[in-house]
Amino acid sequence: MDAGHIPVLLHECIDNLNIRPDGIYVDGTLGMGGHSEQIAGRLTTGTLIGIDRDETAIARAGARLAPFGERVQLVHGNFRDTAAILDRLGIDAVDGMLFDLGVSSPQLDETQRGFSYMHDAPLDMRMDESAALTAREVVNTYSYEELRRILFEYGEERYAPAIAKRICQHREQKPIETTLELADIIRSAMPASALREKQHPAKRSFQAIRIAVNDELGELPPMLDAAEKNLKPGGRLAVITFHSLEDRIVKKKLQELAQGCICPPEFPVCVCGRKPKVKLITRKPIVPGEAELTENPRARSAKLRVAEKC
């Protein structure tokens, strides 16, 4: 396994996917291929479909997964299009799907990608480098109201109005070009009490802008719809989230799919005919243990939810 990349909740994911040697599995967030490597290693006649919007990730994971030969098929694409990708590959149903959401460690560590507030780089933040929208465009062209909404809704940043105002003031003088420039502007808009907090003052704002650039929350409903449509009965969905916004959407959708009869309790028999579409394997999310957190502190906010198609 790549020493520089530690897959989050690896054993918990693999155990909960109930991998069959002849099954078909989707890793919708291929990344460095850590989860995929463990899935492919458990297949004999089965197939793994690895999807990633980041072409750099496809190339790196491709080299890592090359020993598995035709058991692995890699696709440059967005996991929101999972259903269409499977249709294009002529695959109607699969035995399991895994989605590890959010920005990957390599993307954070590659300074030039512009995801990190710790190193100076052009404002980019695109997971798919062929996409048009960049963080620079968001920061320099979105209105005050749009910026305030993004910072508040996607970053849950309580100082969103002040930060959005300061961004607009600075860009009137000259465009905001780099990550450290933006981080300094954010810091300058926050009160002294906020700067004394353990968390970096730019963390929430950078998360919010990244989510906006990549439409990370908008991708979740079609991803979950694909799981409902394309999983075989007994097939499992595993989703790792890293912040409350993602987890809330995933939790709500899975609870809706798991709900059966919605008739009023006074009805003697069911007349709605509604049946559960999935069974929740994890009523509460699985979180990393202390051993994993010691090895990989970035896993601290990870939550794994698992459901099985009925």
Regions found by a protein language model. Name each.
Residues 1-310:
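S-adenosyl-L-methionine-dependent methyltransferase catalytic core, i.e., the SAM/SAH-binding region
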